[in-house]
Amino acid sequence: MSIKVTQEKLPASRVGLQIEVSGEQSRQVYERTLTRLSREVRFPGFRPGKVPRPVLIQRLGETALKANAIEDLVQQSLESAIAQESIPAIGNYQLSSDFETLVAAFQPGKSFSFEASVDVQPTATLAQYTGLTVEVAEVPFDANRVDNVLAEQQKQMATLVPVEGRNAAIGDVAVIDFQGILVESGEEIPGGSGTDFQIEVEEDRFIPGFISGIVGMAIEETRTVDATFPETYAQEEVAGKAAQFTITLKELKTRDLPELDDAFAQEASQYETIEELKTALTERFQAEHESEVKASKRDAILTALADQLDVEIPESLLQREISAMINETASRLSGQGMDVRKLFTEEVLERLRENSKDEDEQRLRRTIALGELAKVTETQVDDEAVKARAAELLSNYPRPQEVDRDRLITVVREELLEDKLLEWFEANNSVTFVAPKAAETEVDAASATVETTATETAEEAPEAPKAKKGKKKA
C-alpha cells in the first residue's frame, strides 16, 4: 500500500504520523471490508457469504460499515507507513484523530487522512563513559560466619533437657498456652491463641513485649503480658495496636549441645572430620563474598553509566519491563508453593505496577546505558566463547534435552558481553572501594518492592511459635 506519510517527533520517544490514503485505496479497503463482513455475519434466509450488499448495508447500517472499514484502513495504513518509513516502532499505536469524526468524513473512493502516534526505540547517548570516578561500597566479610553457622547447627542437633530450679531465661525452649486480646476492643486476636506451643525464648522472636514477658516466669505460672504490634505489621487490623496476652508456662527446657567434633561433622554433613566441614564452609562463604563484591561493583558501575545517559524511555517499553518483573516474581513465588492466582488480584497487580515503576525505569536505564557503551566501544563477544560457556552450563543440567538452546545462547551472550563491558569500564575509569555509608543497604529494589507487595498480606498475627527444625546438612 503506497501512502503519504508525514512524521513529527514527539516527547517520550514517540513519533506522530499524519497519513494520507488515496481514494482508490480507501475504496479497495471498503470493498474488502464488505466482503469480509458478508462472510462473517449471519442473517436468517441467507447462506454464509451470500448476503446481498443492499441487505448487508440495510441490516448493519452505513455508519457501522464505515467504522469497520476505517478500523481496517487505519491498521493496514499504519503497518504500511511503519514499513515504508523504516520506523523502529514498539508497542501499539494510538489514534490521535477522533474516531467518530473520521467515520462521519469517510467516503469510499476519496482520499482519507488521519493522525496517530507510536512509541519508537529510544535514541540514547552517553555524556561521558571514560575518566569517571566511581565509588563502590565495600562488602564486609563476616569472619565469624563459620562459627555462627556451626553454633546454629549445634542448637538444631541439641537434646532438650528439662530445666529445674530456675525461671525462664533467654535461650530456653518453653511450652506455653497463650491467648491474646486487643486492649482497645477486648476482642480476641485472629490467630492469637494456642495450646502446648513450643517456642524458643529468643529476643525479637515475636512482637515487642511477648518474649520479655515470658522471661522470669516459673513453671505453672500464669502471667498477663502487654505487647504492641508494630505500625508496619502485615495485618492492618492489628497494626500499631496494643495487645494483652495471658500466658501459662507449662514446661521449660534447655539445650544440651553436642561437641564440635568429627562425630558432629559426620552427622551434620557429608564430611568425615570437623576440620573438613570448617574448610568447606569457609570456601563456600568466601565464594559467596566474592560474588557479593562483584555484584556491588556491578551495581555502582551501572548506576554511574545510567547517570551519564540521556534518553527518553517510551511508556510501552516501561510497561513491558514492569510486566516482565511481575511475571518473574510470580514464577518465583509459584515455585515456592504459593497460589499466585489468589495472590495476584487486580488490586495487587495495580499496586505492583505503581510501586515498581521507578525501580523498573532505573533498571531500563542501566540496560540501555550498557547497550550504548557496547556501541560506542564496538565491544562484541566471540561466538566460540558463547558456545563454550553454553556447553559448560548444559553439562551441569540434569536434563539438558529440556533446555531451550536458543534462549540459553541469548542469555550467555548477554552475560559475557556485560562482563567484557564492565572490565572495559573498570580499565578506563577510576573504580575504588569505600566504606559503606551508614544505613546503606542496597538491594534489587524492583524485585523487593514487587515481592513484598505480593506477599505482605500472607503473614498472620501473632507470629506462630516455631517448631523445632530437623537436622540440616551443612
UniProtKB/Swiss-Prot annotation:
Stored InterPro entries: PPIase_dom_sf (IPR046357), PPIase_FKBP_dom (IPR001179), Trig_fac (IPR005215), Trigger_fac_C (IPR008880), Trigger_fac_C_sf (IPR037041), Trigger_fac_ribosome-bd_bac (IPR008881), Trigger_fac_ribosome-bd_sf (IPR036611), Trigger_fact/SurA_dom_sf (IPR027304)
Single GO BP term: 'de novo' cotranslational protein folding
Pfam families named in the record: FKBP_C, Trigger_C, Trigger_N
Region (Disordered): 441-474
Keyword Iron tagged: no
Domain named PPIase FKBP-type: residues: 171-258
Catalyzed reactions per annotation: [protein]-peptidylproline (omega=180) = [protein]-peptidylproline (omega=0)
Biased composition (Low complexity): 444-456
Location in the cell: Cytoplasm
Keywords for this protein: Cell cycle, Cell division, Chaperone, Cytoplasm, Isomerase, Rotamase
GO MF annotation: an example: peptidyl-prolyl cis-trans isomerase activity
EC number, as in UniProt: 5.2.1.8
Coiled coil location: none
Domain of life of the source: Bacteria
Ranges that cross the membrane: none
Family: Belongs to the FKBP-type PPIase family. Tig subfamily.
NCBIfam families in the cross-refs: tig
Protein purpose: Involved in protein export. Acts as a chaperone by maintaining the newly synthesized protein in an open conformation. Functions as a peptidyl-prolyl cis-trans isomerase.
Entry domain remark: Consists of 3 domains; the N-terminus binds the ribosome, the middle domain has PPIase activity, while the C-terminus has intrinsic chaperone activity on its own.
Protein name, entry field: Trigger factor
Species annotation: Synechococcus sp. (strain ATCC 27144 / PCC 6301 / SAUG 1402/1) (Anacystis nidulans)
Organismal lineage: Bacteria, Bacillati, Cyanobacteriota, Cyanophyceae, Synechococcales
The encoding gene: tig
